[in-house]
UniProtKB/Swiss-Prot annotation:
Naturally occurring in which organism (per UniProt): Homo sapiens
Protein's name according to its UniProt entry: Membralin
UniProt xrefs under InterPro entries: Membralin
Cited Pfam families: Membralin
N-acetylserine modification, residue list: S2
Role, per record: May have a role in the ERAD pathway required for clearance of misfolded proteins in the endoplasmic reticulum (ER). Promotes survival of motor neurons, probably by protecting against ER stress.
A GO term from the CC aspect: endoplasmic reticulum
Summary of subunit composition and partner proteins: Interacts with ERLIN2.
Residues bearing PTM Phosphothreonine: T29
Region spans: Disordered: 1-33, 474-517, 568-620
Record carries keyword Transmembrane helix: yes
Highest taxon of source: Eukaryota
Sugar-modified residues: N189
Feature: compositional bias, Low complexity: 22-31, 499-517, 568-593
Amino acid sequence: MSEHVEPAAPGPGPNGGGGGPAPARGPRTPNLNPNPLINVRDRLFHALFFKMAVTYSRLFPPAFRRLFEFFVLLKALFVLFVLAYIHIVFSRSPINCLEHVRDKWPREGILRVEVRHNSSRAPVFLQFCDSGGRGSFPGLAVEPGSNLDMEDEEEEELTMEMFGNSSIKFELDIEPKVFKPPSSTEALNDSQEFPFPETPTKVWPQDEYIVEYSLEYGFLRLSQATRQRLSIPVMVVTLDPTRDQCFGDRFSRLLLDEFLGYDDILMSSVKGLAENEENKGFLRNVVSGEHYRFVSMWMARTSYLAAFAIMVIFTLSVSMLLRYSHHQIFVFIVDLLQMLEMNMAIAFPAAPLLTVILALVGMEAIMSEFFNDTTTAFYIILIVWLADQYDAICCHTSTSKRHWLRFFYLYHFAFYAYHYRFNGQYSSLALVTSWLFIQHSMIYFFHHYELPAILQQVRIQEMLLQAPPLGPGTPTALPDDMNNNSGAPATAPDSAGQPPALGPVSPGASGSPGPVAAAPSSLVAAAASVAAAAGGDLGWMAETAAIITDASFLSGLSASLLERRPASPLGPAGGLPHAPQDSVPPSDSAASDTTPLGAAVGGPSPASMAPTEAPSEVGS
């Protein structure tokens, strides 16, 4: 029987070092993420963002960036002004477009409201009402020259137009036998004898606005022929935006005609009639085929708390699902590349991808039920996805990480609060306003925090690359801040215990190294001071600059060693060359690289008789 043995700790390496992974250098935080693919993905996106930011800064000057940022802010403020104006004019004040038919519209029939520009027919007339039923509506204007035959022709045209829109599924399912073949003798009129074509030849244009209101939901689902056969009275009210005063002033009409449309105006007008009825009734949009039901809803001030909770749930759920789907797609792409490179079999992650797709579809369905619109739900998911990508890829400084999400939730909550408080009225315009302010916050944080940090890092890299190369007379000993890995200040060198320098030093007037010798350490100090001056927001930038500093200094060090090795066969005093660095030199021949060679030995020696200019000649 075998026992479970714990794995042994990694043994020492061949040089006495540990065989395990090397500890993290400097201020780097340990990697707590066990999945290396996430690190690869983050590094890839960070590199792409870095390159795009540098290219953007080179193509567009700061003046253009400020102008573009101001333009986005101005656009957001303009849309906010339009929303506030429309809300005050049309939502706060009652809309009385149907006030003249409040007392005489048929409660046992259908009220049909149409918006037509420069219409030539009567503003109010009846359809599908016999001569006896006309007496029930005294004072009602009758369309001049309208007899039964012309009315039938008009209804035939209306029938063709109605069945051309998306509401065809309701009429065909409810009344499948309304249209009889022409040979049938049971047909009542010409409109029923006309066969319905398989493919509709005419659809509603986008500028048509027609709604129908009735207290009975079944009346709205009947076809035009059935309404005429059953003599269901239909009152048609035509509204002309150029003549009716209920559409506001000239600026309001311009906004309604060019940007908003008349759907909300029609629904608000019908809602004014429904508030006076005990049974609120039902509404049908003839053009889109959507059905609505009027209910009594009282939104208190506490509804904002419910809107905030719903916003948090929807946003976090969509963000989690989108991040999971991105990870699964990235893993599949990496596996596919490995298969093409190494000719190895992979397993397609069908179950995770199918799970996340079904979850996204279910989330969109839930959001569509809440917003009563699939388009609004889709655009909200798209906005959350863009914000999630911006936070994961573009936010690196601590200021952006701390404050940008607050602005996003603030603007996003403004849309949820407006939609929940006013029951979805002008919700599309509110969503556009929220997105424009979110877009401005993205551009602002990128211009004022992320881009300066990236440009500062580029300047540090250019300063390191433009440093003078190490010459033969430059000391190749590592600076104190490079040798001292612990971060403690370096102590004064001991003349008895310090290892010899790798090359001669050109002393200055006071016995200290020349200005050339201080070039590498001053360069590193300058880079560190620049990074420290930028504050705590540039921690990741200082770390990258330190890595580049180490690499460039060590490469210059190795190059100088290779250049100086054949040029100095003898020591400074004409003797044998120094021992290698890893061998221990005699204590009486050790000298500090900051002390003149003549002062290193107490008594007279043959080395002291050498000319004092010998070290400089050899070094040069």
